[in-house]
Amino acid sequence: MSRRLRILVAVGLMVIGATVVWRHYRYARPVGEGPAGPAVPHEAFASTWSDRNVVLLGLGDSVTQGLGASPGRMYFRRLVTNPPDEFANMQGICLSRVLPHLEPLNLAISGTTSIECVDYQLPKLTPYDAETFGVVVITTGGNDVIHNYGRTPPREGAMFGARTNEIGEWVENFDRRLDTIADRVRETFPGGCHIFIANIYDPTDGDGDIQHAGLPSWPEGLQVLAAYNEVLARFAKRQPDVTLIDMRAEFHGHGIHCTHFWHREYRQNDPHYWYWDNLEDPNDRGYDAIRRLFLIEMARILPAKL
C-alpha cells in the first residue's frame, strides 16, 4: 500500500469516527437506569399525617394519566403506593403510608388541553362531605402549547407555531381557566383541599430547537412556553391553597441535549433522557422524578393542613 493510500485510508477512518461521535452526541438519548430526581426525606414519612378521609384527585393530561409509563410506574400510582421492586431510597415513602384512609381518583385523560379539562373533567366532580380533605395533582397546559404539532394553523388550545403577538388572549383565557379549576376543586372539597400543579417542561433543554426532535422549527416556541409557565407561576403565587411543582427546572438537562457535555444544562451525575418515545411524556425515570417533586412538597405542606 502506497504512502498516499495509507494517508487517505487514515483520513477516511478519522472522518468516519468523527461522524459516529457526532451522531452519538447529536442523536443519542440513553435513558439510564435506577432512581431519578431529588431525594425525598424519609423522616417526613415515618409517622401518620392524619386519620382523616383523604382523596387524591388527579386532573389534566397524559402526564397525570401516566402515558409512557410501564405498569405501576406512573407518578400518580407511585404517589399512592410503592411498586413491588421499589428503589431502596424510596421504600415506605408514599401517601398510603402516612394517610391510612386515602382514596385515589384519577380523572386525567391523555391529550387533554386546559380547555377540555374544564369542559369534560370538572363536570365529573361531585362534592365530598366536610370530613374529607382533597389532595389534588394537576398537569395541564402542555397540550395547549404543543398541539397540533404544526399540522394546522395556530389557535387557542393548539398553539404550535404561534408568534408571541398572537397569543395574548389565549394566555389570558388560560389564566382564567386555572381559576375556574381551583374554584371547582374547592366546591368539591368543602372540608378543605390543597392543589399541587406542575409547570410545563421543555424537551429542548432551553434551546428551543424542536426541529431536532422531529417537529417543525418554531422560532418563538420558547417565548410561548414561557408565557404559559408564567401564568402557572402567578396562579400558584396568588392562591394560598396552590403549590407550584417546578417540573420544568428538574427536567432541564434530561431532554434532547442530555448527552451534550458542553451544554449549559448538562447533568453530569445523570446525563440521561427522561422523556418517552413521543417526546411529550416522561419515561419511567421521568415519572420517578415527578413523583419525588410532588412528595417533597406534599410532605412540607400537608401535615400542618390535615
Identify the residue ranges that each predicted region occupies.
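Residue-level signal for beta-strand positions within conserved beta-sheet cores that form or flank
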Residues: R52, P100-E103, G191, P240
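N-terminal secretory targeting modules
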Residues: M1-L59, V63-P84, S96-V98, E131, ...
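N-terminal carbohydrate-binding/catalytic regions of secreted carbohydrate-active enzymes
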Residues: Q65-Y128
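Alpha-helical cap/lid subdomain in secreted, periplasmic
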Residues: S2-R6, L122-L279, D284, D288, ...
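Short beta-strand segments
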Residues: G60, A108, I138-T140
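Residue-level signal for short, function-critical loop segments
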Residues: S62, S110, N199-Y201
